Amino acid sequence: MNHNINHLQKMKRTFLYSSLFGVGMLFAACAEKSRPDLTLPCQNTIAIESTDTPESIMEKAAHIVPSPMQMEALKNEFIAFIHFGPNTFTRMEWGNGMEDPRVFDLKQLDTDQWCEAMKAAGMKMVIFTAKHHDGFVLWQSRYTRHGIMSTDFREGKGDILKDLSASCQKYGLKLGVYLSPADLYQIEHPQGLYGNLSPYTERTIPREVPGRPFANKTTFRFMLDDYNEYFMNQLFELLTEYGPIHEVWFDGAHPKRKGGQRYNYPAWKELIHKLAPQAVIFGREDIRWCGNESGKTRDTEWNVIPYPENPDTTSHFPDMTDEDLGSRTQLCKAKYLHYQQAETNTSIREGWFYRDDDRQRVRSVDDVFDIYERAVGGNSTFLLNIPPNREGRFSAQDVSVLKEVGKRINQTYTTDYLQGAEGPEELLDNNTDTYIVVGPDKKEIVIETPDPVTINRFLIQEAITVSSERVEKHALDAWIDNAWQEVATGTNIGYKRILRFPDVTSNKFRLRILESRMKPAICQVAAYHYAARPPRLEVKRNTEGNVTISTMQQKFGWKTYTQDIARNLNAGFKIHYTTDGSTPTAESKEYTQPFALESGMVKAVALLNNEKGEVCQQQLGTLKRNGRSNRKDLLW
C-alpha cells in the first residue's frame, strides 16, 4: 500500500513529542508539528537490492506497512474457528475421504447459539470449515454430491454455511471460509479430479450447471486442469452466495498427494480479489500461520518479515516456525521485505473436532484469557477453535468458558485509567488515526493522572499504517517515592503490545523508547487493571527428597508447551509455607527454591495484593531411598 503526500496530509495531527522531567516536576512537552519520519514511499512489499547495506535495509523495513485489508483483519483481534463435519461423528481428527456421507448424522442445528457464545466472548469474526481435508462439503454445492446434500439432514436440503451466514448477520459477526486445497475424496475416488493428470485448457469459471444459475454474472477465463477448475467453481460459490466473506483460509496441511497436483494460486487470488475485495487470504501473502497449534506466542512477533522471493507474485509460502522471524539479522538475509501478520491458532478442546464431553478436556478460562493477552497484546490475532457437538451446538462447558473470557476482557479493558490524564492528546483520544512521532533525542512520553491509579496492564500501539512497526525495545516506568521505577519492559510494539506486571500505584507514568528503526509513531497508550487473584498451588517431592511448590497446572493434554499461566496472569504473588502443621501466613517462610524434607506436613498458600489464596497441604511420608515413599494424596 503506497502512502503519498496527500494521504499523509489527511492525518489529523502529528507531533514530535519530547518530555522532560525534573525532580518531582513535569515540564511542558516540546510538541513541534511534524510529519512521519519518512524517507521512502510506504509499501506492503519492498525489494532488497544487491547494493543495499544493513542500514538501508533497516530504512526499507521502516517503510513496510499493512494493506487496508490486513489492517482491518488486525482490528478483529479475537476470532473464532469452527471445525465441523464427518469427523465430528467418527471422532477422528482427519478423515480418509471415503466416509459414507450419511455418517454425518446431524438432526438439529443452532448456529444462533454458536454466534451468541462467540459474541459473548468478544470475538468479531468466525471462520468455518466449509470443506476439510476429507472433501466433504457443508454447503449446497453444484459441483459434487460428496457433502451435506447426500445426508438425511433436512432431507438433503440443509446448508450449514447458509444458516451460519444468517446468524452472523444477526449477531454482527464477520464470516470467513476455510476451503482445504487438500481433498481426499477427490484423491481416493476412482473418478476423482485431484492429480488425475488432466491437461490445462482454457476454462470458464463458474461452469454452468443446468437449473442452478448464479445471481452474480461475473465470469473468468483461466488455464486450468480439472481439480483447479473444481476448486475455483466452489470458491465462486462461497464468495458470491453467502454474504460478505472477510477471510479465505487455505490450510497448508496435506494428508496425501497424488499425480503431482499443482495449484493455480494466481488464478485463485484473482478470483478472490475480484469477488471479495475486502477479504484477506490466510496461508498466502496476507496472513501467516504462527508456527504451532498450541497457542504459544513469540516474545517478539515482527510482522515485517523477510522473503526469498516476491510474495506478491509467488505461489510458494512455506510455514515459518522459527522463533526469530523479523530481527535485523533476519531482515538482512532477505530478497524482499513484506508485511504479513500472524494468526495465533489453537482449539478450546483437545483436538480440532468435537469427540465427547467426558474424556476430551476443555481449556480453562485462565488459559484462554492468557493466550488472548499474549496474542492480541503481542502483535498478532487470536484464532480460537470451538467445535460444535453432534447436536449441532457448542457444548455447555465450552460456552461457559467463552462467556467468562468475554467477561474478563470487558472487566479488564473497559476502564482506561489514563482517561482525563495530562499528556499528548493524540495518545489519549482513543483515536488511532492521531499519533505523535517520538525522538530522536528524547524518546520519552510522560503521562500524569489527576490522582494516583493502580494498574497492572499497559497498552501501546504504533501507527503502523503511517510509518510501519519500528519500536525494537521499550520500557515503562512509574513515579514512586519521588523517583522513577521501571515496572515493565518489552521488545517490539507494532499493532498492539500489552505489558503485564504486578500492581503499581502512581499518578505519573513514563514510556521510554529504547531502540527503534528510525523514529516511531505512537498512536495510543492506555492503562488497565486486571483483577488478579492468588493462584492454586501444588506440592511435589522428588526421589532426592527436594520439595517444590508451584502453581497448579491445568489438565490439558493436547499440543502442550511450557507456560506458567497463573504467573502470567497474576504477576507478583508470593508463596509462603510451613512444615510444622501450622497454617501459613504472610509471616511464614517465603518459598523461593526447592527445599529438602525427609517427612512432614507441608502447607502452602499464595498471597497477592493482601489477598490470601486456598491453602494447599500435603503429608509427606518418610522418604524411601529406592524412590518410593508413603506420600498421601493432596488435600485442600
Predicted stretch roles:
Residues 4-19:
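Bacterial N-terminal signal peptides that target proteins for export
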Residues 20-21, 25:
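Hydrophobic helical h-region of N-terminal Sec-dependent signal peptides
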Residues 28-29:
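C-terminal motif of bacterial Sec signal peptides marking the signal peptidase cleavage site
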Residues 34-441, 445-474, 478-502, 512-523, ...:
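Mature catalytic domains of secreted/periplasmic carbohydrate-active enzymes
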Residues 456, 472-474, 507, 571-575:
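Short beta-strand/loop motifs in extracellular/secreted proteins, especially
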Residues 457, 506-510, 599-603:
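Short, conserved beta-strand segments of beta-strand-rich sandwich/propeller modules, principally
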Residues 530-636:
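Short, compositionally stereotyped local motifs that mark structural "simplifiers"
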